[in-house]
UniProtKB/Swiss-Prot annotation:
Designated name of the protein: COP9 signalosome complex subunit 2
InterPro entries, per the entry: 26S_Proteasome/COP9_Components, PCI_dom, WH_DNA-bd_sf
Matches recorded under Pfam families: PCI
Quaternary structure (record): Component of the CSN complex, probably composed of CSN1, CSN2, CSN3, CSN4, CSN5 (CSN5A or CSN5B), CSN6 (CSN6A or CSN6B), CSN7 and CSN8. In the CSN complex, it probably interacts directly with CSN1 and CSN4. Interacts directly with CUL1 and CUL3A.
Amino acid sequence: MASDADMEDYGFEYSDEEQEEQDVDIENQYYNSKGMVETEPEEALSGFAEVVQMEPEKADWGFKALKQTVKIYYRLGKYKEMMEAYTEMLTYIKSAVTRNYSEKCINNIMDFVSGSASQNTGLLQEFYQTTLKALEEAKNERLWFKTNLKLCNIWFDIGEYRRMTKILKELHKSCQKEDGTDDQKKGSQLLEVYAIEIQIYTETKDNKKLKQLYHKALAIKSAIPHPRIMGIIRECGGKMHMAERQWEEAATDFFEAFKNYDEAGNQRRIQCLKYLVLANMLMESEVNPFDGQEAKPYKNDPEILAMTNLIAAYQRNEIIEFERILKSNRRTIMDDPFIRNYMEDLLKKVRTQVLLKLIKPYTKIGIPFISKELNVPETDVTELLVSLILDSRIDGHIDEMNRYLLRGDSGNGRKLHKAVDKWNSQLKSLSSNITSRVC
């Protein structure tokens, strides 16, 4: 006859086996349901609901089943049911599943919903608010921070800047000490917040705030940020310098942005390489960016090839070829609003280089001849010559009667053109005064 101890052992063994069998049944039910997701979504939903019911208490399989349920309801366009399932799923994150696993799953669902519902702002708002509330209750600060960042990025992508203000304040507050100063120990998080704010100021062209934040971001030394974040900060810095006509500083920032994006495997590297080429030409640099080892692998990239040819024509001072490349590569060059914004500056630089080279052997040269060589109207040639004389880059003056540039006698030339320039300014001022009085 078995002892009490033997009976107890037998009982425990029987109990363990029963639990294992139950776990196997739940697992089988989960995978059978998952197999029907694509072909029979309604049947899959019933199966996943059964998985949740089969678990005696909240655990992994129920969490996984609810995650699948959320995705199916979303695909079916049943957003009310989706939110109900998602809200139930979030009750598991306090203790039923590990923090790392719950973070991974929630991130996965957020990416899934955000990627498909960017136009459904009402759903996104409810979805993220539900997530944030659950994360606050679970005291998961790290995922709360990441979720708010994701929400900010969604609003940024669809131009909802006002919606971002409150979230950014909360994010910034979470990176501060009790005295209200920035906590340098949270340098990486601070940079992520700064990167979003910097993008807003770049888009809204608020250069004053952009400059302040840009310098604050570069001053943070305690962080090891993701290269994508530094790519964003440097790209926006480059655009800021371009707006201020600081071509050299812009080129430095675009190069840093390119390197960071390249390290992160981000496609923005191609755009920043284009911007680097643009800044290099505007600063009249003789250095070809594609000669460096970092940019060399992209020299023959289809998106970059037009810029490669453009800088080659620029360095050879071939204005007609330069303009031909611009016209025949509208999609890769001129369709970018940022590049297009500086094209007049760039064309003026190229024409200036060609003009200076053209007039070098002559003491007297006809404006019609220059016009033909530069492929621009004579009035544009005259304007360009006047600006170069006033800037002391050409030693000479214009004989407007005979349509010649006469080199030498720069003093009289500059005095004459300064007087004409002053006269033009006074005429504009007089015209404005008369208009304002009449109106």
